[in-house]
Amino acid sequence: PEWFIKKFMDNSVTTKHIESLAVTLRTCAIGWLQSFVEAKGTHVLSSYLIALQTRGSMNEQDLAQEYEVLKAFRSLFNSKPGAHDALQHPKCITGISRSLVSQQLSTRKQAADILLFLCHWEKPRGHSLVLQGLDELRVAFDRHGRFDAWFTALEAAIDGRGRMGSLVGASDEVRRLQMSAMPEAGLPEYVVNNMFL
């Protein structure tokens, strides 16, 4: 765990490193995962995600890294120690909430999945923390309502759908998503996850 954390801390982490971390968190022994949590791995991932999001305009590498960090979070939160640690770090939930308005639809879907899980993990604390994250999203985007920035991104995705469900007239974002090798990241699943959230 320390090797990954060092890569994030000295800002030498690559997209491949983050992919590798997500796979390791998904397949490792629970002891390794607990060591990652105890070494402040959740905090380090949160800080890195927020740093990516606040750089200004994100390039393709930044967008890929944002998505991979969310995959790492998802793997981490699939364990009791990881999910419990997430609720101890509101900054983590803030970063994930900011991903609800990412430029990439697949990233927004991943963020909605994670936040939906956290809402139900430790009631009512998880739900309250997700609402706080949405409040911080409102402040970051200078909106009046808690859900305005999130709903604007959701509405743009729905409006970008092609004619009769095809790619004809679809937005570049929806076109990219449907052409990707991730059938689970389709527009209908994204919309349903947002409805549940």
Regions found by a protein language model. Name each.
Residues 1-148, 159-167, 176-189:
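Elongated alpha-helical scaffolds that mediate protein-protein interactions in large eukaryotic proteins
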Residues 187-197:
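Extended serine/threonine-enriched, polar tracts that run as long, contiguous segments within proteins
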Residues 172-174:
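Low-complexity, polar-biased intrinsically disordered regions enriched in Pro/Ser/Thr/Gly
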